[in-house]
């Protein structure tokens, strides 16, 4: 039935850590921590496919990722206290070959050199690990702590100064930069000790990086701090050290102080302050030296990337290039602020420099330049930074909406046409709109039409949104979606500074409403920028110009919304909220015509309802609940009232997480999925009693958390997708009381955590079916299934 399954897209955001990413200098592959996985991305791939794989293994948020220079190895660390060693199995995929379980607290810093890594732990210990050439495994060579009160490392940087002789720069919860030296011998680490404390910073040190100068024995060390300054330190060895006599009466200042020490009898080292770089308005997050030129890239919490280099005439370090945004204090992401940059990367490809940085929203921004003067912003990648809670295809199946606990609703669609209207050879998926940037965690979403959706956050109300003209034009241009009645669409949307509601940006907007929400009366021209796009929107456009205006709020629930569904005729909304009693565990029905509740509410359950599903013909409404019961409500098609028709008080032994209806041609059949690890099929029978009876059941090894049935039958069988709490996904065909396993998706392409939602697209493209997957591992994934 199914010939092959291909991951079409993986949308996942980067963790908010300063050492969360690195790039392989030869392969040009970016690895970054994304939740408890490591995402792999080729930023120069010509088709802009985005993340192509996620590496599983860690059990908590990944904090550090480093490629070992001049090798096929990568090192990662996590809040699970583990360090993992990875090795490339081919040009673009890695496999874990070693897990270091030595630590009892979070790993917060990593640095790597060929066959050598240093690890900083939140308990204050700093470890040096050496690789065994015979089996590629790393063994502990030395471990020490900085004896300076309460101190734990935040950043590390290793540098080889001579054969088998090394320096380790350490920054952390102290204003000083600590320098340790050691000798690598056949027997292990010798003479490892802290030899200098570089003074000057006024706050914690967050980033360190060594650079080898053209002259052998001459090095630069840069240090970035929360005091907003970057300091450069000159390191010289032996004959390069300034040994001129110093006047003992002369006042020693930080600017002329020399730190001198010996690594052994043959190697002397001198360190002095070289330069102070000022210009950033917030904490220094990440520093990167250029591969060949004397230039320094800095990413900071003021949402800027700046390239610094010495002036040819004066030698003073000046900013030669600034990228990012002009941020303002107190600005939120909803009003256009990125929330600062966390890590940055810098690499050269085909005589072009590429700058990468990740921000608060989990997205990656990319710029490219040939002359370091004019920069061209390139298409980056994006994704949620917290659990994806729900997904929903548009009725046409041409785009996918996803909600997340990161308080966003995102729209994903395939990039099919270029700006000139030509069809692209390979269609790739991208985030085309961010309809909702909210102040509450987002819980559920459902589309009403191709131009309207309803969502529920961690609040008591439902909100409805309409597609604006600018986004409609962009989707028509790049995706090929045709929308009717564009003239009636709102022009755009904005978020008031003190509000939660996306306001329509039209000239005739209600001024009283704007004043009530604390918004600005001026309507910015935010439609035109979208018409100028040559590719899918980038992060700054997603944050500012691609919101959808909110058209209605639906009230009635007493607690936070948990689930909702839209009737097939698009006339009704069914919703439920959190509850621990019968009074609040009711289903409320709203009309999409007048946005009013159709009373009475529907009581039956006693705990939180987990899923609501209308039958394909809209005549029945199915509810499943934490109380382990399911109920079936029959709809009066004339007045849209409901009556409890069928119920089962003991269908499962644990919570029922999900349910779905089979296609109408298969009969009156629905399927339930439960924490008791079972999937059960229920069919309507009129004899011996008019009821829904259990027709078949299948049990898995883990709790079943999501289920979805395709709208169409294939070879007179229904196609069922099943998701488990550990991220596994199964595909079954079902008929006549018999499950037949089609395939279990390969572990390499499935999520690393609970499947929160599975949804089949109604659309078939080029003989392929499309399955959307939302997961607690932060990812939204889209798979294509080629079938016979």
Curated annotation (Swiss-Prot):
Annotated region (Disordered), positions in chain: 490-530
One Pfam match: WD40
Cysteine pairings via disulfide bonds: none
Source organism, top-level taxon: Eukaryota
Signal peptide stretch: none
Protein's UniProt keywords contain Repeat: yes
Residues the record lists as Phosphoserine modifications: 492
Bias kind Acidic residues: ranges: 507-517
Main location, first listed in the record: cytoplasm
CDD domains listed in its UniProt record: WD40 (cd00200)
One GO cellular component, as annotated: elongator holoenzyme complex
Outcome reported for the amino acid change (mutating residue 626 to A): Dramatically reduced interaction with microtubules but no effect on interaction with ELP1/IKI3 or ELP3
WD repeats: 13-51, 57-96, 102-139, 200-243, 279-318, 336-377, 383-422, 437-475, 556-600, 604-643, 651-692, 699-742, 750-788
Pathway(s) per entry: tRNA modification; 5-methoxycarbonylmethyl-2-thiouridine-tRNA biosynthesis
Swiss-Prot/TrEMBL keywords: Cytoplasm, Nucleus, Phosphoprotein, Protein transport, Repeat, Transport, tRNA processing, WD repeat
Molecular function GO terms recorded: microtubule binding
Cited Gene3D superfamilies: YVTN repeat-like/Quinoprotein amine dehydrogenase
Compartments reported by the entry: Cytoplasm; Nucleus
Role played: Component of the elongator complex, a multiprotein complex which is required for multiple tRNA modifications, including mcm5U (5-methoxycarbonylmethyl uridine), mcm5s2U (5-methoxycarbonylmethyl-2-thiouridine), and ncm5U (5-carbamoylmethyl uridine). The elongator complex catalyzes formation of carboxymethyluridine in the wobble base at position 34 in tRNAs. It functions as a gamma-toxin target (TOT); disruption of the complex confers resistance to Kluyveromyces lactis toxin zymocin (pGKL1 killer toxin). May also be involved in sensitivity to Pichia inositovora toxin.
Other information: Present with 6090 molecules/cell in log phase SD medium.
Annotated domain remarks: Folds into a two seven-bladed beta-propeller structure which is required for elongator complex assembly and association with microtubules.
Name of the featured protein: Elongator complex protein 2
Annotated gene: ELP2
